[in-house]
């Protein structure tokens, strides 16, 4: 009876219980309903959290190539034979940095973010860079590229760079040339690519339109009223709507195509003429790498996804968006994991003993390429964030150990160098004795330690976010699973203590009343039977 009362009391509470992940599931279902999807009811939204399952990449449309913004990062190296021109070279380098738009202050972190991603669909534009000594970032097959633009790696052309402190104007490398298969691009009037300033002020001729500028059209755009045009002077793409006139401004400060072509240059050298002749003196060389500034966009190179491309990169890449491998399964399909049913009913269709691994949905935009959003289960995201933080922290500790070993080795080498110089002091030192150039090691451990410190800060930030956001629910589930076996006995004892005296009193009164009724009946029987015996004729 106590168990029956317990079930009657707890059934409404269990029916009204709502797991916190129901909100994510409801949002996903509402998103399906708002898009008119036939799977808005009676279906499962699933995605795999396994690292072996490849993700999906969706190429950006031709028009999105004109709006996605990039940023540049410059690192430089002085020429060893600079000598007395160091002051002028430093002034020139400062001017070059000022004239470059949208310079990234923090050094980018290179390397693939994901390495097992499949491109879905055909990319309208791909960029290929081929250098024997380049850094390979991955190569897309030509079958998934509609138009492939190839960056010429052998270009060695220069242009004068205005600087009033030099007697002869310095020379500056021009942007690399872009080649493409004959007949893939269409010639258009020059007016469509002239007068297109960028959204930021720049004095660098790499980003300024020329007086005469050939304009080429990227074919196979969905709308006949819209064009995507290639500016070969600045290696930039423009979106053109023929119904709105020719003077349509460029949106990004540095376009993604311009950043990709500039980053293919290796040791771009600035040189100045010493005399009126043809001899030149090199001042400094600089590396330019590029990153995507627009959030959510990535470089898709083969099966690798990158946020930044290093200097002298090689491979075939496009740009696009990334999502996990998400699928929609019909409701009658047997799934390998338990998951929740319809959220509008108070009862649960399947047993709640595991939360969903991951729930999400990516909606492709009007061009069929953009991703509107991805929803994830809270608990899985929390665990993933913790794992990433732990991996970053472990990597930082490993880098610290390696750097300490390098510092120790450098100290030993320098000590040996001093000893050899002392032994060969009569000959002018070890370098003069060997008749070779002297090489000195420059310790970069400070920069490495700064990067390690940044990695540790990122790890601590991820751990704090995971703890603050999701630890309460995780702790609640652990506490609930521990207390649940004792809930039944505790509730039964509580009910017994609350209602036991009342029930005992009722039982006592009932027994007492029955006893009194029995005694009264017995007295009546004693009185009635003697009288009946006296009146009997027998």
From Swiss-Prot:
Record site: Cleavage: 350-351
Bilayer-crossing regions: 479-499
Gene3D superfamilies associated with the record: 1.10.287.210
This protein's record includes keyword Cell membrane: yes
InterPro entries in the cross-refs: TLV/ENV_coat_polyprotein
One BP term from GO: syncytium formation
Disulfide bridge partners, by residue number: 43-46, 43-439, 431-438
Protein keywords: Cell membrane, Cleavage on pair of basic residues, Disulfide bond, ERV, Glycoprotein, Membrane, Signal, Transmembrane, Transmembrane helix, Transposable element, Viral envelope protein, Virion
Signal peptide: 1-15
Domain notes: The CKS-17 immunosuppressive domain is present in many retroviral envelope proteins. As a synthetic peptide, it inhibits immune function in vitro and in vivo.
The name this protein goes by in its record: Syncytin-2
Species classification: Eukaryota, Metazoa, Chordata, Craniata, Vertebrata
């Amino acid at each position: 009876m106590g168990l029956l009362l317990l079930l009657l009391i707890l059934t409404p509470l269990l029916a009204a219980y709502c797991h916190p992940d129901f909100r994510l599931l409801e949002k996903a279902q509402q998103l399906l309903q708002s898009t008119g999807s036939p799977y808005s009811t009676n279906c499962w939204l699933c995605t795999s959290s396994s690292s072996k399952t490849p993700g999906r990449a969706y190429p950006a449309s031709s028009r999105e190539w004109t709006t996605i913004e990039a940023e540049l990062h410059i690192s430089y190296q002085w020429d060893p034979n600079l000598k007395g021109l160091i002051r002028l070279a430093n002034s020139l380098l400062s001017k070059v940095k000022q004239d470059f738009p949208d310079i990234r202050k923090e050094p980018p972190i290179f390397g693939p973010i994901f390495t097992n991603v499949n491109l879905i669909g055909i990319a309208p534009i791909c960029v290929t860079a081929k250098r024997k000594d380049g850094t390979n970032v991955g190569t897309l097959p030509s079958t998934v590229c509609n138009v492939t633009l190839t960056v010429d790696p052998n270009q060695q052309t220069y242009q004068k760079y205005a600087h009033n402190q030099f007697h002869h104007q310095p020379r500056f490398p021009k942007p690399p040339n872009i080649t493409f298969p004959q007949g893939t691009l269409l010639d258009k009037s020059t007016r469509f690519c002239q007068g297109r300033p960028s959204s930021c002020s720049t004095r660098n001729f790499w980003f300024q339109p020329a007086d005469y500028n050939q304009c080429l059209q990227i074919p196979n755009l969905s709308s006949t009223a819209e064009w995507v045009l290639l500016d070969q002077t600045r290696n930039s793409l423009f979106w053109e709507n023929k119904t709105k006139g020719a003077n349509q401004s460029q949106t990004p400060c540095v376009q993604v195509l311009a950043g990709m072509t500039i980053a293919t240059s290796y040791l771009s050298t600035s040189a100045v003429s010493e005399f009126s002749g043809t001899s030149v003196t090199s001042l400094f060389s600089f590396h330019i790498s590029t990153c995507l500034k627009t959030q959510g966009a990535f470089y898709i190179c083969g099966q690798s996804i990158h946020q930044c491309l290093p200097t002298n990169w090689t491979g075939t890449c496009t740009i696009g968006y990334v999502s996990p491998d998400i699928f929609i399964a019909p409701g009658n399909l047997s799934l390998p994991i338990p998951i929740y049913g319809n959220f509008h009913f108070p009862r649960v269709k399947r047993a709640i003993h595991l939360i969903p691994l991951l729930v999400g949905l990516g909606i492709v935009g009007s061009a069929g390429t953009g991703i509107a959003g991805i929803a994830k289960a809270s608990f899985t995201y929390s665990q993933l964030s913790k794992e990433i933080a732990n991996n970053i922290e472990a990597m930082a500790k490993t880098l610290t150990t390696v750097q300490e070993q390098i510092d120790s080795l450098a100290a030993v080498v320098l000590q040996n160098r001093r000893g050899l110089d002392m032994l060969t002091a009569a000959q002018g030192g070890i370098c003069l004795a060997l008749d070779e150039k002297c090489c000195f090691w420059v310790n970069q451990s400070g920069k490495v330690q700064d990067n390690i410190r940044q990695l540790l800060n990122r790890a601590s930030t991820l751990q704090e976010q995971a703890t603050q956001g999701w630890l309460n629910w995780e702790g609640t589930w652990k506490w609930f699973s521990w207390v649940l076996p004792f809930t039944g006995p505790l509730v039964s004892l509580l009910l017994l203590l609350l209602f036991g005296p009342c029930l005992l009193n009722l039982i006592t009164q009932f027994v007492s009343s029955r006893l009194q009724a029995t005694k009264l009946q017995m007295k009546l029987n004693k009185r009635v039977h003697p009288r009946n015996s006296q009146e009997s004729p027998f």
